[in-house]
């Protein structure tokens, strides 16, 4: 039987994977993907805790996180497309020249 600790271990592994992706990548698209993995890890944890304690509050928070993540992707990718058109690069190091 799958217990709450199994879900929390999966959520923790997803969270660590997202943190490693944020720390190790220089590509802005990969940074977006890593931040989405972080948010999905929080969703898994909230939904699992909510199910095992028979409280719908965690699932409602997970729904709000999905909405925030969707808006983050829409705004972030729009800005990323504009940045690519301006500089021709999506590497993180190209953002050092934003003041110019």
From Swiss-Prot:
Compartment(s) where it occurs, according to its Swiss-Prot or TrEMBL record: Cell inner membrane
EC number(s) on file: 7.1.1.-
Catalyses which reaction(s): a quinone + NADH + 5 H(+)(in) = a quinol + NAD(+) + 4 H(+)(out)
Gene3D superfamilies: 1.10.287.3510
Pfam families: Oxidored_q2
InterPro entries with a match to the protein in the record: NADH_UbQ_OxRdtase_chain4L/K (IPR001133), NUOK/Mnh_C1-like (IPR039428)
Membrane topology: Multi-pass membrane protein
Entry annotated with the keyword Transport: yes
Bilayer-spanning residue ranges: 2-22, 29-49, 63-83
GO molecular function, one term: NADH:ubiquinone reductase (non-electrogenic) activity
GO biological process: ATP synthesis coupled electron transport
Entry annotated with the keyword Transmembrane helix: yes
Keywords: Cell inner membrane, Cell membrane, Membrane, NAD, Quinone, Translocase, Transmembrane, Transmembrane helix, Transport, Ubiquinone
GO cellular component, one term: NADH dehydrogenase complex
Similarity comment: Belongs to the complex I subunit 4L family.
Role noted for this protein: NDH-1 shuttles electrons from NADH, via FMN and iron-sulfur (Fe-S) centers, to quinones in the respiratory chain. The immediate electron acceptor for the enzyme in this species is believed to be ubiquinone. Couples the redox reaction to proton translocation (for every two electrons transferred, four hydrogen ions are translocated across the cytoplasmic membrane), and thus conserves the redox energy in a proton gradient.
Binding partners and assembly: NDH-1 is composed of 14 different subunits. Subunits NuoA, H, J, K, L, M, N constitute the membrane sector of the complex.
Name of this protein: NADH-quinone oxidoreductase subunit K
Species for this entry: Campylobacter curvus (strain 525.92)
């Amino acid at each position: 039987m799958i217990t709450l600790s199994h879900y929390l271990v999966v959520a923790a592994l997803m969270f660590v994977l997202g943190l490693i992706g944020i720390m190790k990548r220089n590509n802005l698209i990969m940074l977006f993907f890593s931040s989405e993995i972080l948010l999905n890890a929080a969703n898994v944890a909230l939904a699992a805790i909510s199910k095992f304690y028979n409280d719908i509050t965690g699932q409602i928070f997970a729904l709000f996180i999905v909405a925030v993540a969707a808006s983050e992707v829409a705004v972030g990718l729009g800005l990323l497309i504009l940045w690519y058109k301006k500089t021709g690069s999506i590497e993180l190091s190209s953002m050092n020249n934003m003041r110019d």
